[in-house]
């Protein structure tokens, strides 16, 4: 009788231990763990066009965003001059400049990189004897946005096309570029390096180095109005500089500007100049100091 009671007690203890062990070791495919993984993944899913959400650790997420879930933007601008790296492309006349871009979502929450394609255009004027009427640029590249969009990068390609230009002038060319930037809050800085294996007008190898600092003005009197100032400086090197129409193989350009954004419309006034005098700029004033006003809107 005593042995029977001891056996029953041992059996009950074994059943209790087994039940405790089962509750403590939930299977990896159980609903509880699956719900936790879904919630964790949702918390770390980035908004399209933004960097990944800040979390303590990333889940083993391998899903890539759909290729057609991106964003389309269109910008329309009008300016009193089209200045390309300090040199007027319209002989100081008005320019109209539309731009269209499609950007994909970021690849994943752990790889905040997106791809983009687009086109940008402007009227140009190179003189009465030159039939070129417009520049149309085709662009493509990869963009990085990390650290809550504070760190940005752009690895891009531009194909410059000049409508109406005779083929034997070799105006069309390719350019590759890398742009890096960081937003410190009180100021944003950007730097770029651009390379062309054969620049405008068959001018050979060309390099352009550029830097810019933008400072938002903290004063606000309306939530729909914002101000900022910026300064930029660049250096252009051209191998066969005479083909490009300048007097030496490199020059500097710089500008200082002020932008007011009013209900989504950007109004910019900029002072632009180069170190190229008239004799070194094809005996024109296209490289001289000037003020350029631009109005633009992005949709």
Region annotations inferred by a language model:
Residues 78-84, 104, 119-125, 144, ...:
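Transmembrane beta-strands of outer-membrane beta-barrel pores
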Residues 41, 260-262, 285-299:
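Outer-membrane beta-barrel "beta-signal"
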Residues 70, 92-96, 113, 132-136, ...:
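Residues that define the transmembrane beta-barrel architecture of outer-membrane proteins
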Residues 171-245, 271:
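Detector for outer-membrane/organellar transmembrane beta-barrel domains
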Residues 90, 107-171:
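Surface-exposed loop and membrane-interface regions of Gram-negative outer-membrane beta-barrel proteins
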Residues 2-73:
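N-terminal periplasmic/intermembrane-space "pro-region" immediately following the signal or transit peptide
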Residues 74-76, 100, 115-119, 140, ...:
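Membrane-embedded beta-strand positions of outer-membrane beta-barrel proteins
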